[in-house]
């Protein structure tokens, strides 16, 4: 398949500071996803269709769901290489995550420990939904830009050239 699903679940480190940190980080990520990176990207990663974190058991555990294009190996590499600081900010609050410094440094930079951590917490996915079969996140972004160009009542010459290049 072009698109795959990833689910991981694990316990949160105990303590009020960790809970407040995790809640604050996820609130920030949610705000940024809606207001800064809302053009189909998560940071510099352009292959993610969907991502969601959900607290469980009175906020003692957490589950992460994601739909992405490519292999699980390329998915993990994208996070390490493109948004490592954000990955560390979220997952460093999880029990067993590779040690970080100042919340966002190190952690996933130890690639093997990070990948081992994810593999230990990965759950098999029984069912999931994809609205646009056969289309990657990049295809969907391009199609959105084509539609916006068709709906536009005025394009500059440069914008018209950029739009035509999408076809």
Predicted regions span which residues?
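Short S/T/G/P-rich N-terminal loop/turn motif that feeds into the first structured element of a domain
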Residues: 1-49, 57-61, 67-72, 105-167
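Aromatic/basic-lined ligand-recognition segments
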Residues: 54
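An amphipathic, aromatic/His-enriched active-site/gating alpha helix that lines ligand/cofactor pockets
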Residues: 69-105
């Amino acid at each position: 398949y072009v698109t795959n699903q990833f689910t991981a679940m694990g316990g949160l480190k105990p303590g009020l500071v960790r809970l407040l940190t995790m809640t604050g980080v996820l609130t920030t990520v949610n705000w940024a996803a809606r207001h800064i990176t809302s053009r189909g990207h998560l940071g510099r990663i352009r292959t993610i269709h969907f991502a969601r974190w959900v607290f469980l058991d009175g906020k003692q555990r957490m589950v992460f769901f994601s739909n992405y294009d490519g292999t699980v190996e390329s998915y993990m590499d994208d996070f390490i290489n493109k948004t490592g600081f954000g990955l560390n900010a979220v997952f460093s609050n999880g029990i067993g995550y590779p040690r970080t410094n100042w919340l966002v440094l190190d952690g996933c930079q130890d690639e093997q420990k990070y990948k081992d951590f994810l593999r230990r917490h990965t759950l098999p996915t029984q069912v999931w939904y994809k609205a646009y079969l056969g289309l990657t996140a990049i295809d969907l972004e391009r199609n959105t830009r084509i539609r916006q160009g068709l709906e536009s009542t005025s394009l500059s010459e440069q914008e018209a050239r950029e739009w035509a290049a999408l076809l």
